Amino acid sequence: MGCPVSRGGSPGCGRRIAEELRLAEDARLRLALLGRCIVKGSPAQVRKELRAELKAIDAEWRPVIARESLRKELDAIDAEWQHAITFWHISRAIIGSIELSKELDAIDAEWRPVIVRESLRKELKAIDAEWRPAIRLESAYRAIIGSIELSKELKAIDAETQHAVELRRALRTIEGRIELSRELKAIDAEWAPRIAQAKEIAQARESLRKELNDIDAEWAPKIAQAKEIAQAKAELAAATDALKRAADKLQALGKMGTTSTPGTDLIGVVTTAVTTTLAGTQPAPGTDLVGVATPSTALGQPAPSTALTSVAAEVATPSTALGV
């Protein structure tokens, strides 16, 4: 049996049951205690105590008895109304199912296009998966045909515009050449004075080089002779020093004659050398070019005639030759 107040097995029902069990245990203990008292006391006193104890037990159990009677009544009412309650639950369930059906119908009506689209999409995907090889083949075939047609059209366009393209290329080439010619002419006009000046300088250098080569060829023997004369002059100076030292020794020893002096002997030797040298020389020619140095001047040496004259002047007197 369920709880008379809380009929669903709630925590309140458990507490009441525990309370009833506690009261029953107390009544049992009291009855046991009363039984022991009956054994020990007189019957009148025992009846009095028993009556008082029963009244106390009735007072304590009256609410429990009332609840028990109320529970029995409720159980009877539940039994009477069970069919009505069941019918009510069934009607509620039917009404709920009807409302749920209406809501589901509304949802179906709302989602029907989506469902249809989804089903169509699935069917189309299946069709695509089935026809994909054929579609690819057709696409490739169309691409090949399109490329062939496009190639033909491009070739036709190239054939039509070939002359125009060639003419445009030739025109661009001519324009480029004209622009290049203008630039080159401008460069030539800008650099013409410098080029002419450079040519004149090159010609002047060439003519000067030829003249210098001619002068070098003309003066080469004289330059060689001047070198020989310089070498002879050095040798003559060395010989003069040797003769001077020898004459000094002879004079110191008194071996020289009274009629001969170191100066006269040396004059004879030098005169012979100078006469021989002057016989083989010629007068220096005049300068043909104004401002052009002679080879001897370029070599840093005096002219041959000047060299011989200086040698003769140095040995002209005995005192000069002997260093007196």
UniProtKB/Swiss-Prot annotation:
Which biological processes are named by the entry's GO terms?
biological process involved in interaction with host
List where this protein forms a coiled coil: 195-255
Endpoints of the signal sequence: 1-32
Q: What does the UniProt entry say about where the protein is found? A: Secreted
Q: What GO cellular component entries does it have?
A: symbiont-containing vacuole
What are the GO MF terms of this UniProt record? Answer: actin filament binding
UniProt keywords, alphabetically: Coiled coil, Secreted, Signal
Query: What's the superkingdom here?
Result: Bacteria
Q: In UniProt terms, what function does this protein have?
A: Associates with actin filament appendages that are formed in the inclusion appendages of the parasitophorous vacuole during infection of the host erythrocyte.
* Name listed for the protein in its UniProt record: Appendage-associated protein
Species annotation:
Anaplasma marginale (strain Florida)
Q: What is the lineage of its organism?
A: Bacteria, Pseudomonadati, Pseudomonadota, Alphaproteobacteria, Rickettsiales
Question: Could you tell me the gene encoding this protein?
Answer: aaaP1
